[in-house]
Amino acid sequence: MVAIRPDEISTIIRQQIESYNQEVQVSNVGTVLQVGDGTARIYGLQQAMSGELLEFEDGTVGIALNLEEDNVGAVLMGDGFGIKEGGTVKATGKIAQVPVGDALVGRVVDALGRPIDGKGEILASETRLVESPAPGIVARKSVCEPMQTGITAIDAMIPVGRGQRELIIGDRKTGKTAIAIDTIINQKSEDVICVYVAIGQKASTVAQVIDTLTQRGAMDYTVVVAANANDPATLQYIAPYTGASIAEYFMYKGKATLVIYDDLTKQAQAYRQLSLLMRRPPGREAYPGDVFYLHSRLLERAAKLSDALGGGSMTALPIIETQAGDVSAYIPTNVISITDGQIFLSTDLFNAGFRPAINAGISVSRVGSAAQTKAMKKVAGKLKLELAQFDELEAFAQFASDLDAATQAQLARGQRLRQILKQPQNFPLSVWEQVAVVYAGLNGYLDDIATDKVIDFCAGLREYLKTSKPRYVEIVSTEKQLNDEAEGLLKDGINEYKQAFK
């Protein structure tokens, strides 16, 4: 047996003491007092931050929404069926973040950026905070580039610019989503990343939208964020912010982005539900006092960045659903005051067969005219006025039996102008096509064509110009201007086709 000397024993003990490493993990832990209706009240968590992510024993994640004197009110991002009274809750020390990057393009994700399209995991390059601050005044630049929707009525009368917030408002089933989808389809050759956020919609409706985008090849540059009607209210509340964060990544990379929020009425209702369950005092229409801030902090994130920051942009098209055309309700007035204009869709026009059913009288674009293409600005300058005068005359003509020739001519022109603004769904038009039909309508070329033949004439004219006047198409498409040469070619083309049409 080998004898161990006493000094060796002391050396071994010293080495073991020195190599001993005691890891102390300090966790901010609380106890569940009450749980139900997608919310939980937690005792403890004295150090919790507002908006901090909390982790429950069953793996459910919540957000600390109410920080009260003796408890914390949290909203759950899951059903919470596994949470029990007395269970422990751990504060993570993190604020909600979502994965962002090129890997998300062409994918369908939930409000936390997790894939729900069955195409495997998303290997995102980085993450962004769900609630990111909006760009400041110095970081912005005034809107100066057009965001072509492909819808003649909008691009001619209510132009949208890159970095603008343009509200789409109307009753249910008036074609609000159709306008948004057409705008996404029209970005195919424009190098714009699109984000479609579906809030509180039926899963079948969202599937239909994704199917349409896939068929038209639009999913190649689109991200869909879906918080369906059966998802927890918390996910419906944060889904728009997730969409904005995904778009912001591309905006700060210098790219143009387009975000559709479909629709913010459902988000406000989800937030109202959470606030009432958290026992926050209700205000007008039972919405909480900060419901204006809910939408303003979201829509202020849309911007046209200065050249120093890369000149990227985020254009927002929020959608609001009204009840019986009441635009003076709480949420519609809030969002109208935040946005840079609104496109109002009328049920009466929709039912009368005018689609898109845009009411030009109360639809405005406050900053878009600065971004309108020169060709369209030159051609469509008096279109809105002519239509407004026609609406007044039409109402007056119902009571007058004998009208003078000038009034009859104006009524006839107005009816034809309405026809040229009709457009089938998922059929966006390029700038040169829009300029041609608006020019023909406003300059009297359609006055002697029967009203029911106007749509056929316009379709034929577009085909004729494409084949017989390629120089006109080239000038307007590349220079975005209607110079003397292009105008001459357009006049010749209209007259030539008119002879053949008759």
Swiss-Prot record:
SUPFAM superfamilies: C-terminal domain of alpha and beta subunits of F1 ATP synthase, N-terminal domain of alpha and beta subunits of F1 ATP synthase, P-loop containing nucleoside triphosphate hydrolases
Site, as annotated: Required for activity: S363
PROSITE patterns registered for this protein in UniProt: ATPASE_ALPHA_BETA
Keywords: ATP synthesis, ATP-binding, CF(1), Hydrogen ion transport, Ion transport, Membrane, Nucleotide-binding, Thylakoid, Translocase, Transport
Subcellular location(s) per record: Cellular thylakoid membrane
Gene3D superfamilies assigned to the protein according to its UniProt record, in alphabetical order: 2.40.30.20, ATP synthase alpha/beta chain, C-terminal domain, P-loop containing nucleotide triphosphate hydrolases
Annotated catalysed reactions: ATP + H2O + 4 H(+)(in) = ADP + phosphate + 5 H(+)(out)
Gene Ontology CC terms, in alphabetical order: plasma membrane-derived thylakoid membrane; proton-transporting ATP synthase complex
Pfam family, one: ATP-synt_ab_C
Membrane topology: Peripheral membrane protein
Domain of life according to the entry: Bacteria
Record-level Gene Ontology MF annotations: ADP binding; ATP binding; proton-transporting ATP synthase activity, rotational mechanism
Entry binding sites for ATP: G170, D171, R172, K173, T174, G175, K176, T177
Enzyme class label: translocase
EC number: 7.1.2.2
Protein name, as recorded: ATP synthase subunit alpha
Lineage of the species this protein comes from: Bacteria, Bacillati, Cyanobacteriota, Cyanophyceae, Oscillatoriophycideae
